[in-house]
C-alpha cells in the first residue's frame, strides 16, 4: 500500500514522503491517526496545496516538543518504594509510576513517550530515563528512587 506521510514518522519517513507500508499498518494506524493518506492522484494534488500549512504545523510541533524537553531535562522526580535492606525493591518502578510522578508535578505525558529499554527499575538509586517527546527530540529525565519508611 502506498501512502503519503502528513508528518514525520519514526523509522518510516518525513513529511511528504511517498512510502510503501503494509496495508494493516496503513489502514489501522497511519490513516486513522492522521499521519498519512492514501497515495492517490487526488490526494497527491491536495497534499501539494497543503504542504506549506503542514510544514508550518510540523515546525510548531517541533518547537513545542523542544520546550517540553527543556522542562523535562530540568526535572527530577523522586519515587518512594518499599525496599529491602540491600536496596532491592519489592516490585519495580516502571513507566506507570514515572508517569504518575510527572502528573503530580503537573507535567502531562503519555506512557508511550517514556522509554525504558532495560526494563523497569528494581533497586534504589538515581537513574536517567529517556522521554521521546517528538521523533526528533529526546529528553533525559532524572529519576531518584528512595526507600519508603
UniProtKB/Swiss-Prot annotation:
Question: One GO biological process from the UniProt record?
Answer: translation
User: Would the keyword Zinc turn up in this protein's UniProt record?
Assistant: no
Name assigned to this protein = Large ribosomal subunit protein bL9
Known SUPFAM superfamilies for this protein? L9 N-domain-like, Ribosomal protein L9 C-domain
The yes or no answer to whether the keyword Transferase is present is no
Q: Which family does it belong to?
A: Belongs to the bacterial ribosomal protein bL9 family.
Source taxon at top rank: Bacteria
- Organism equals Legionella pneumophila (strain Lens)
Annotated GO molecular function terms are: rRNA binding; structural constituent of ribosome
HAMAP family membership: Ribosomal_bL9 (MF_00503)
A GO cellular component annotation in the UniProt record: ribonucleoprotein complex
Q: Which key words tag this protein in UniProt?
A: Ribonucleoprotein, Ribosomal protein, RNA-binding, rRNA-binding
**Which InterPro entries does the UniProt record give?**
Ribosomal_bL9, Ribosomal_bL9/RNase_H1_N, Ribosomal_bL9_bac/chp, Ribosomal_bL9_C, Ribosomal_bL9_C_sf, Ribosomal_bL9_N, Ribosomal_bL9_N_sf
Q: What role is this protein assigned? A: Binds to the 23S rRNA.
